[in-house]
């Protein structure tokens, strides 16, 4: 006689439990395959997972390559690919059917930097349909890339991914001449080689599910920029159908968060490290003293109101003619300047963490 009431109660409890369930995000990275502090897939994924948890009840997992555990994809709301040629990873023959089933289920899909690419002809079309756009890395493909300082600009201020950030300077390895589906919507633009290109996009798949692609994140240190990381985390939130806060995602971090694990840190060029010379070596002392003076010069400019892009441009111009500096080695990252001495010692001048731009 009371069975309908009991049944209704069980249904309501199940509904409430479903509402309270954490949002599951699987981030797929891989071991290092590039030079020092670039393509730092796994450390980047760990940081993104950390920032997601600052924005609600998220359950995250970072996988080293395509997961083989039977329940790895169970209940996953979104998959983030930050690896070598994400399309080839996602639609690899060994699990292409599994990947397509995830897409058909309507999961969110996010690809970052090289993860946006595909080189295998068999994966290219399925990847394009899944992501809405991709870096065509096939032999003879038309997509290009260039390392260049640019400004990341809002393409659609009304889109949720655009919340909480404004145009910001960034040096990255930009992919351009990408292939897009007509329904893909640019959310971020950058000028590469003097021409505007979409570098971030959102795509609502006709069969259900959201996809977000962003070609930046070649350099690990770019994550020191708050608007840069907010753009990325906004995109992941949107892909999971989580409401993006009006002020954008929370993306708090500390300087130590940019430290790399040993697997990636060991890529530091040991042969060109001052540590290979005896302690107290007069040359090392002089070069380190010079580096400290250059850092002080950069700090002084910022303390006196010089904007970050101008301060970086000024210190870069100064280093190009500084004694003992290899001018071909001087590079800005948007959050600092790398340079090497004529002996091959590498140094980095960094924008103080508390002076990096915030986009509220």
Regions found by a protein language model. Give the residues of each.
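Positively charged n-region of N-terminal signal peptides that target proteins for export
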Residues: 1-4
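Helical hinge/lid and interdomain linker segments adjacent to catalytic or ligand-binding clefts
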Residues: 24-28, 33-118
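Charged, low-complexity interaction regions
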Residues: 301-309
């Amino acid at each position: 006689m009371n069975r309908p009431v009991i049944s209704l109660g069980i249904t309501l409890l199940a509904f409430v439990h479903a509402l309270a369930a954490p949002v599951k995000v699987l981030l797929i990275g891989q071991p290092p395959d590039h030079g020092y502090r670039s393509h730092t897939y796994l450390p980047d994924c760990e940081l993104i997972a950390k920032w997601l948890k600052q924005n609600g009840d998220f359950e995250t997992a970072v996988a080293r390559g395509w997961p083989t555990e039977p329940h790895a994809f169970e209940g996953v709301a979104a998959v983030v690919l930050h690896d070598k040629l994400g399309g080839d990873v996602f639609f690899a023959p060994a699990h292409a059917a599994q990947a397509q089933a995830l897409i058909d289920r309507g999961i969110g899909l996010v690809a970052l930097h090289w993860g946006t690419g595909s080189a295998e002809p068999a994966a290219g079309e399925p990847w394009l349909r899944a992501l809405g756009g991709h870096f065509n890395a096939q032999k003879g493909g038309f997509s290009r890339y260039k390392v260049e300082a640019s400004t990341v600009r809002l393409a659609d201020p009304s889109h949720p991914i655009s919340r909480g950030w404004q145009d910001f300077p960034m040096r990255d390895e930009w992919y351009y001449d990408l292939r897009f589906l007509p329904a893909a919507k640019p959310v971020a633009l950058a000028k590469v080689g003097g021409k505007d290109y979409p570098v971030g996009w959102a795509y609502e798949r006709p069969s259900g599910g959201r996809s977000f692609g962003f070609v930046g994140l070649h350099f690990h240190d770019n994550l020191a920029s708050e608007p840069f990381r907010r753009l990325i985390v906004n995109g992941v939130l949107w892909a999971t159908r989580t409401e993006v806060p009006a002020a954008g995602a929370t993306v708090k971090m500390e300087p130590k968060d940019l430290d790399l694990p040993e697997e990636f840190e060991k890529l530091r060029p040991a042969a060109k490290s001052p540590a290979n010379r005896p302690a107290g070596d007069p040359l090392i002392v002089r070069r380190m003293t010079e580096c400290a003076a250059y850092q002080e010069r950069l700090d002084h400019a910022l303390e006196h109101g010089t904007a970050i892009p101008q301060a970086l441009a000024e210190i870069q111009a100064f280093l190009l003619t500084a004694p003992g500096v290899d001018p071909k080695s001087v590079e800005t990252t948007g959050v600092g300047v790398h340079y090497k001495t004529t002996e091959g010692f590498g140094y980095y001048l960094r924008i103080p963490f508390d002076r990096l731009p915030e986009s509220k």
